[in-house]
Every structure is written in C-alpha cells, then in structure tokens.
Amino acid sequence: MNYFQLFNIEVSFDVDLQQLSSSYQTLQKTVHPDKFAHASEQEQRIAVQKSAQINDAYQTLKNPLQRAEYILVQRSVEMPNEQHSFQDTSFLMRQMELREMLEDVRHSGDVDAALLEVQSVLSTEYLQLSQVMRTQISENNAASNSAACDNLRKLKFYQKLNIEVDRLEDSLFDD
C-alpha cells in the first residue's frame, strides 16, 4: 500500500496537512471497527487491520522526517541505521560544537539567554537543512536521493538535540 495513493495526494515532501487530515478522517469513517460491530469476526479483524494501516500511514505522512524517510524508502534508497557513522567530518565537528554549546548553558551566567541562543541556532540550522533536503527530494535522482538520505540523518540529530534542549530547560527551571 502506497501511503500517498491511500490519501490521494501527490508524492511530495510538502504535504497539505489539512487535506491529509480530511482524507484520513474520511477513510477512518469507512473502516472504523465500530461500523463492523455486528459483522463477522473476520470482517471485524480486517476492519481493525485497515484502520491500523490508515493510522500508520497518517502518522508517517504528517511528520516531515518520517515522510521524507518514507519517500526515500519508496524510491529504494538504502537507509543506513542510526549507528552508522557519518562520513561528513564537518558535520561531526558541528555535532560536537552544538553539544558543547548545550553543555555550556548549565554554566552560563544568563541561562535564559544561553538557552535562547541554542534554540535559535538549532532552529535556524534545522530549517536551512530541511530546505536543502526538500529540494533534493524534489529532484529525485540517485545523487539527490542519496544526499537527502544523509541530510535526513542530520535532521534527526537536530531533532534529538532539540529534545535534549527541552529536557535541559525543564531540569533547570523545575528547581
């Protein structure tokens, strides 16, 4: 099952989330298990399976990074696992710099300003890299798909680092 076809939307990194949501609700109404309460056990099981598939498809397409990964997998791009090391040494250095920047927040004289700075840097870099990946996905050739795969992994790093920033913020201001 192709998720984009399921929701009758064009294969693209940019998705109209309102259209996606509307299609999702329409599909769920047709297969919702409650509609099959008086059906046979097999029909109920099929309804539950279809509903779960629609939920999975919706969750994948509404999340930009999951959507990008789905598109790349559909294009048979080999997705390295999370443990696979980056070949991009400049990005490895940037990872270390960002982690140091995050660690420095704890020891800053102005924690609020330091946190805002980290959040601003992460947001800016995430948006820039996301735009690059968006272009690469739209180009849809072997080189651009491979580059998009690398950038997707980088964006996942930024996403995880943002979670760490949120946790740090919670720990600093919960006291």
Curated annotation (Swiss-Prot):
CDD domains: DnaJ. Gene3D superfamilies: DnaJ domain (1.10.287.110), HscB, C-terminal domain (1.20.1280.20). It comes from the Bacteria. GO terms for cellular component: iron-sulfur cluster transfer complex. Keywords: Chaperone. One of its GO terms (molecular function) is ATPase activator activity. GO terms for biological process: [2Fe-2S] cluster assembly; protein complex oligomerization; protein folding. Residues 2-74 form the J domain. Interacts with HscA and stimulates its ATPase activity. Co-chaperone involved in the maturation of iron-sulfur cluster-containing proteins. Seems to help targeting proteins to be folded toward HscA. This is Co-chaperone protein HscB homolog. It comes from Colwellia psychrerythraea (strain 34H / ATCC BAA-681) (Vibrio psychroerythus). The gene is hscB.
